[in-house]
Amino acid sequence: MATYTCITCRVAFRDADMQRAHYKTDWHRYNLRRKVASMAPVTAEGFQERVRAQRAVAEEESKGSATYCTVCSKKFASFNAYENHLKSRRHVELEKKAVQAVNRKVEMMNEKNLEKGLGVDSVDKDAMNAAIQQAIKAQPSMSPKKAPPAPAKEARNVVAVGTGGRGTHDRDPSEKPPRLQWFEQQAKKLAKQQEEDSEEEEEDLDGDDWEDIDSDEELECEDTEAMDDVVEQDAEEEEAEEGPPLGAIPITDCLFCSHHSSSLMKNVAHMTKDHSFFIPDIEYLSDIKGLIKYLGEKVGVGKICLWCNEKGKSFYSTEAVQAHMNDKSHCKLFTDGDAALEFADFYDFRSSYPDHKEGEDPNKAEELPSEKNLEYDDETMELILPSGARVGHRSLMRYYKQRFGLSRAVAVAKNRKAVGRVLQQYRALGWTGSTGAALMRERDMQYVQRMKSKWMLKTGMKNNATKQMHFRVQVRF
């Protein structure tokens, strides 16, 4: 009598090795499923016949389904027509677009893996390209819904593990985050500007020593000054003609998604309606174009969240920082405390000054009277000009040299209409402003609420039953 048997398949074995090998076969697994269904087991020959029959049916189905193109979503009557379609120009173009779409998805997933610290060594580029081609290749299937998605998933996994970084380029671990690089660039610009300002001040101080010169020398100086003005104008024009930095978001593109608008105002309206993005103190905004351009560089080049700024984690792609701002509801500017100095060059708060006259153009230079009356303050050591400007003493120059942020040209006249249109959109959405009568009404309502709360607390404490000195029993037994 055989010692080693299989009760499910009803067979016997000579040794334990053959028995263990039998337990790993498909025949044994098939009989186990039949046993669960209370069906009789099949023999090895019967199982092989069933396998061959199933393979024949699968081949028949594959032949019939080979006339469907998954890329173009078209069905063909014959296999020859299907092969001719694969060589057509339209199919090649659609296949190329599919390859680009897969590449974009792979790069986005690799960026997420990189942020999570899942980057690994790269693999062969040929293997990666083969995986992408396999993912988008027109595989025959019965219908688009029944097309097996396994190859695409495998291809994405292969490419994601293979690249482990930004698409086809591997990120150097020693490379600085884009946010830090952008901050360093801004610091260099600020230092360069401070050096230029200090040089101009030194030239002004040197010019205080007056000397008698001839008329010819005066003409030469005038010519030199004219040439300097021309050179400065040319330099300004060159700076204006310089394009935006690489990766910066244009002023017609949304800062929080991939939406593109035909104009700046439509872009601002889109960000307000779809992302609830409001520009703070917009009634004092003087350069809306410059502000949106600066924010585009901050998000596109520096990969910086507008609310987190230097805090929070670093991002290595524009899509990642946009997704963060949308998910965390950070589609707003952080202007608390000293952070507001970052955007000071785009605002003009002169209209909020107490000595500002209504209807006065802040850009228009005041006409000086014929009689020059100058005032001097001994305490502050300042000379007050008729225009209201204050001139400090030379001994306090170290304090006047301080610079807070980059200085930019203010263009109120060019942006007044644009700011007005944005204000109309804000008011249409229920915005009441952060200053003026609306702010006073809000403060009054807060005061009324506080007084009401105090009165209710006082009344409740006065009528509280626990403060009764003598308690009368309500129930008598």
From Swiss-Prot:
Compositionally biased spans, kind Acidic residues: 196-212
Entry keyword set: Acetylation, Cytoplasm, Metal-binding, Nucleus, Phosphoprotein, Repeat, Ribosome biogenesis, Ubl conjugation, Zinc, Zinc-finger
Biological process according to GO: intrinsic apoptotic signaling pathway in response to oxidative stress; positive regulation of apoptotic process; positive regulation of JNK cascade; positive regulation of kinase activity; positive regulation of MAPK cascade; ribosomal large subunit biogenesis
Signal peptide residues on this chain, from the entry's feature table: none
Protein localization: Cytoplasm; Nucleus
Residue(s) carrying N-acetylalanine: A2
Keyword Ribosomal protein (UniProt): no
Tissue: Expressed in lung, kidney, spleen, liver and brain with lowest expression in kidney.
Location of the region described as Disordered in the Swiss-Prot/TrEMBL record: 135-212
Domain of life: Eukaryota
Zn-finger (U1-type) residues: 4-28, 67-91
Residue spans of biased composition, Basic and acidic residues class: 167-178
GO cellular component, one term: Golgi apparatus
Molecular function GO labels: preribosome binding; RNA binding; zinc ion binding
Phosphoserine PTM positions: S276
SMART domains given in the database record: ZnF_C2H2 (SM00355), ZnF_U1 (SM00451)
Post-translational modification note: Phosphorylated by MELK. The phosphorylation may redirect the protein to the nucleus.
Function of the protein: Pre-60S-associated cytoplasmic factor involved in the cytoplasmic maturation of the 60S subunit.
Subunit structure and binding partners: Homo- and heterodimer. Associates with pre-60S ribosomal particles. Interacts with MELK and MYBL2. Interacts with DNAJC21.
Similarity annotation: Belongs to the REI1 family.
Xref: PANTHER family: CYTOPLASMIC 60S SUBUNIT BIOGENESIS FACTOR ZNF622, ZINC FINGER PROTEIN 622
Protein name: Cytoplasmic 60S subunit biogenesis factor ZNF622
